Amino acid sequence: MRILGWNCRGICNASTVQALGAQIKGARPEVVFLSKTKAKLNRMESVKKTLKFDDSCVVEAKGHAGGLCLMWKFGVDIKVVEYNKNLIAVKVSDQCVEWLLVGFYGPPYHSKKKKAWGDLFALLESHQGLWAIMGDFNYIVNEEEQLGGNRGGSLATNYLKELLFELNAVDLGYSGNKYTWVGGKWGKASIKRRLDRGVAIIS
């Protein structure tokens, strides 16, 4: 099964839908997870039809912030388990194996991290079996995942590191561009980080 995850930072522009369509054409995923759609249900229904997906679970944006969507093709056996403003969780039956797939958006603001990550941990700990998470975690695991800016360690809790360590999960790695986010000014003053990834428990 091929799965595509993307922090689209708003899906209301035709150019963004075209860019997503190009990615889908190249990767040919059966499942797509979008975060920060900044869109309501009717807009996501239109996007789903444009991209030729058959079913979806949508968490609407609040005003012009947030918004999640998981879309899948006909023939993919998916049952929605749970959803909130930070995650969509589904059970996937794939070749006689049932596993949990979670599309996750980790809030960048410290005041909102504890609740979002607490919900994620509770969901994973209640599931008996295999699981995988994809999305924008808004954390780096080590200094090699950042280029530029202050690379000093933070005393704040890194929930992604806790997830990898406490639940014996693994980072699924990447191909292509190492960094998925660029902030600050362009050029030497810019900061690049790997915030988007896939994480799974494989045994």
Residue ranges and their predicted role:
Residues 1-203:
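A shared catalytic/ligand-binding motif for oxyanion handling
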